[in-house]
Amino acid sequence: MDKKALKRLEYHKVLEQLAACSGSSLGREKIMAMEPLDNLQAILRKQEETSEGRKLLRLEPFAEAGGWKDIRAQLRKAGQGAILDPEELLAVADTLTAGRTIRKFFQDRQEQYPLLYEVSSALVSLPELERKIKNAILPGGEVADGASPELAQIRRRLAAAQAQVKEHLEHIIRSPSYQKYLQEPIVTIREGRYVVPVKIEHRSQVPGIVHDQSASGATLFIEPMAVVEKNNELRRLMAAEKREIQRILAELSAGVAQHAGPIGASLEALGELDFIMARARYSQKLDAWAPLLEGEACMDIRRGRHPLLQGEVVPIDIRLGADFDTLVITGPNTGGKTVALKTAGLLVLMAQSGLHIPAGEGSRLGIFRQVFADIGDEQSIEQSLSTFSSHMNNIVEIIGKAGPDSLVLLDELGAGTDPAEGAALAQSILEKLHSAGAKTVATTHYGELKDFALTRERVENASVEFDAITLRPTYRLLIGKPGRSNAFEIAARLGLPEEVVKRARSFLTAEHIQAEELMRSLEKTQQEAEAERRRAAELASEARALKERYEKIEADLASKRESILSKAAEEAQALVRAARLEAEAAVRELREKMAEEAARERENAIREAREKLRKLQQRVGRAVPEKTVPGEAPAGLRPGEEVFLTRYNQKGYVLEPPGAGGEVLVQVGVIKMNVPLRELRRVKEARPAGGQSEVAGVLLNKAREISPELDLRGLYADEALLEVEKYLDDAYLAGLSRVYLIHGKGTGSLRAAIHRQLSGHRRVKSFRLGEHGEGGLGVTVVELA
């Protein structure tokens, strides 16, 4: 890229602003060495890196990529075999820590930031070296006691020796016999040895070695002979400490030297990441965007802003290379022609450097292999060159180098010489560049160049807008419309007397005045039309906004209506559910009352049946003659023992042993009766064959009729509860001890109703759900009382 063009377009000032966004010297070096690229793929890569950095700033603004140092000097020093001091080693450890942390950060987010992750993958992880340095060096740069066992031992001995010396000297300075010889009762250090300040006139009273004298000469710093050997021991220990520290530092430095290559690559990656993040911060600062890039040399900049201008900047639209290759910008001085020229050139350089550009989304830029610029007055006093000669030197060089992939920016082309000759020369230069295929933007005052643009293919006029009402430039660039210099209006606004301006107008030809008036009228009409267009666009925008607002209101109302209707429906359903629950509760209460009534009736029937059974038993007892059964009446009967009732030809169980009357309380099935002892035989004894008694037959028939299972599936809850109530009574009469109520799994409501009925039931001892093989959740097993 042409170095002169970079300077004329003030590319270096962009780099200075960019460097201020960097966080390291390594990053700043990369920035100041940066130049525009001319390879599309390389530029795209740089732009994507900047975009990823911008994304990181947006999504994770507090992510920290600092904490590392520029340790290139330390790596070189260690590589040459030198010993690094503690601060240098600590800088290496801090850099290793930062690199490891940053690598882990991007490793966890490699899908979000693939390019940043790729750069960070070069960061080396040396946890062992990092640990050794941080264990050995304290944050302040002091070597830690635990750096080695030897150092810890030496320092313990050193502390003990220092304590002994101080204690001895403290004893001396507190001694009344010595205090009169001392300048002050203190212990101090001179030349690394502990001494006391002695008045010079008492030198002979304090035997020892003089190490120093005060500036006034009145005080001698003497090491008493009593502590000389102890001080010598201190010096030996201090020397040993120094040697051990040097050994530790040498060992750590050797570790750094061993890994100098990977650490250097890691440092380079850290610098590259800082470089990328500086570009991202600069993009954020400028509110810039990544342009759309393509291979052909062209530009379509929308709402572009010059990055170096402060305050409110009027954006410009400028295009080149699609419909035309040469753009001639005309208009007044101070109207913004040069700024438009510099903006176009600088945004091209920024984009090809991987920087986002301060322009609107959708801006497109092609790749220019060369950018040339002739901007400003570069007159050289040393070379005795005029303005015109200086410009011509630049243009001659540009014509010799420009080609199809070149962008040429020419400010005030043909200025500095005779207007007629300058205009002719300017046309010829533009023709030459046009025929070479260069993309050219030129500013000029010459009206002849407006005609040139109108008569040549792929050459277009443009102008910087001048407000005919306020007589001030608007700084907007209008492509397709030639401009006027507006010299008289500007001169009048700047204070030139009106009569001078009028006199100047009188020198113009009638044709020129007529053309100028026509141009002015056309410009005014165009500005009014543009103002009307903008007003129409604003009204259309307001109408769209109102439409969107009313549509939103309508949607909100529809949503609220749906919400109200939905809420009303829910409330209605809630009322229905509540009414249904109340009705079900009333029905359940009625059924419970009916069930209680039926239970009472069944209880009465059972009592009547029992009474009939008791009477029948008595009748049968009288009717059945006493049989003679072999064996004797059992002696020593105990409760629970099984016995055979000879009269009834049935087995039973002893409930109570024989009483005073010689009768035994025995239970046969559900019947309890007192039986004379003589009518009982132990079960193991033989019994006579014969038919069953009438009572036994009734009981056995009842037991045969009642199944131990009751299937309730398919019944409503109230029907099932009545069935259960009747069944429990029948099962109890039949002498069943366990029954199975089959209710199925279903929703569980029938099971719950049955369990409520069983809880506290007079016939129920306990109940549980069926186990595996018994029917599981679909069966309730009931133990009868």
Curated annotation (Swiss-Prot):
Principal EC category: hydrolase
InterPro entries per the UniProt record, alphabetical: DNA_mismatch_repair_MutS_C, DNA_mismatch_repair_MutS_core, DNA_mismatch_repair_MutS_sf, MSSS, MutS, MutS2, P-loop_NTPase, Smr_dom
Example of a GO MF term: ATP-dependent DNA damage sensor activity
Database matches in Pfam families: MSSS, MutS_V, Smr
EC number from the UniProt entry: 3.1.-.-, 3.6.4.-
Smr domain residues: 710-785
Residues annotated to bind ATP: G331, P332, N333, T334, G335, G336, K337, T338
Presence of keyword Magnesium: no
Gene Ontology biological-process entries: mismatch repair; negative regulation of DNA recombination; rescue of stalled ribosome
Keyword annotations: ATP-binding, DNA-binding, Endonuclease, Hydrolase, Nuclease, Nucleotide-binding, RNA-binding, rRNA-binding
Protein's job: Endonuclease that is involved in the suppression of homologous recombination and thus may have a key role in the control of bacterial genetic diversity.
UniProt similarity note: Belongs to the DNA mismatch repair MutS family. MutS2 subfamily.
NCBIfam families: mutS2 (TIGR01069)
Protein name per UniProt: Endonuclease MutS2
Protein species of origin: Pelotomaculum thermopropionicum (strain DSM 13744 / JCM 10971 / SI)
